[in-house]
Amino acid sequence: YNGSMAAIVYDASASKVLIASSSSGAAGAAIVGTVSGTTISFGTAITYSTSNDSYYFSAAYDANAQKTLIVYDANISGVRRGACVVATVSGTSVTVGTEVLYSNFNTSNSNAGVSYDSDAKKLTIFFKETSTPQYNALVGTISGTSVTFGTPVALTLNGDLSTETGFVAAYDPTAGKTALIYATKTATTGLYYGVWTTGYTATNL
């Protein structure tokens, strides 16, 4: 689940859930959960990020790397940037690699979405920024405790995306494509959707 203030994923290799959110000081935080019956217990939370102003978390588990990519919006030197870390779960503990900026432009008011393509063994981040093109998809590859990215691909989206924009994405292994849902704070025509492959088009839902 990709939420505006928290994200949760299932780590299949560790048989645990991983939650990413803001800490009480607004730095990035992560904690491992173990489900037993109808209850859940937690390990010790960690904090990360060079910013004490991190919000809009999304996450996706990479089954090939057996790690999770946590994506969030961070205040870097007074400018909101798209940032991410690679998280590794071991038992009831989690560690993260060095923070990586996936956008050097302002990503304010954008809840990025991230999904894992199990066929390509890659992750894709969908996000909004103040540059041109404004809406992009970015493919990433996890290696060790870090992630590297290719060249952003511009998205042509429908609807009024001038204000807050939220993205949620999920990969369909049968179709071999990623479904992208996005919405805005001011949208009056509902949600929008699109299908991501090597190209991209979007249709109003």
Predicted regions and their residues:
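Polar, enzyme-active/binding microenvironments
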Residues: Y1-L205
